[in-house]
Structure formats: C-alpha cells, structure tokens
Amino acid sequence: MAKRVKLDARLDSAAADRLRAQLSGSADGDLTLDATSVEMLGGLCLELILSARSLWSARAKAFAVDAPSAAMIDDLARYGLTPEALAGDAA
C-alpha cells in the first residue's frame, strides 16, 4: 500500500527540511504526494520532489503527485514544467 503525504501549503526554503524528512521517511515503498493544498512551490522543494521522483523510479517504486492545486500548476509553469513532469515512471 502506498504511503500518502500531504504537502504543506508553502513549499519554500523554510519547508525544505520538513519535506526532505517526509520523503526520507517514506523511502521504503510507494509514495503519493497530496498536492491539493499547495499555495506556493519554491525551487528547492521542487528539486526535492523531482529528485524523489527519480529515486523512486530507480527503485522501481510507484511515485505520484496527486491533484496539484492551481497555484502549484502555475508555479510549475514558471519553471517551464507541467504536472506530468512530476509523474513517476515505476509501477
């Protein structure tokens, strides 16, 4: 069963340590990030999410970002990304 982690509303540099800890604590299985409440996505947290996606894929574990908020989608667009860029490759 996949672990589900609800992302903080503000994913700025102040939230990076907490996000890193949440990701590290979930590294042993499939992971879904609940992005419904994200109001701001900063570069450092985006890097952590993209890195986690790659790590989960390398481990052949499922990784998903579920229901990104409109604000998160807007922030992704500013980085030249779409929500699909956060999708994991493993099943």
Where is each model-derived feature located?
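STAS-like cytosolic regulatory interaction modules
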Residues: 1-44, 48-91
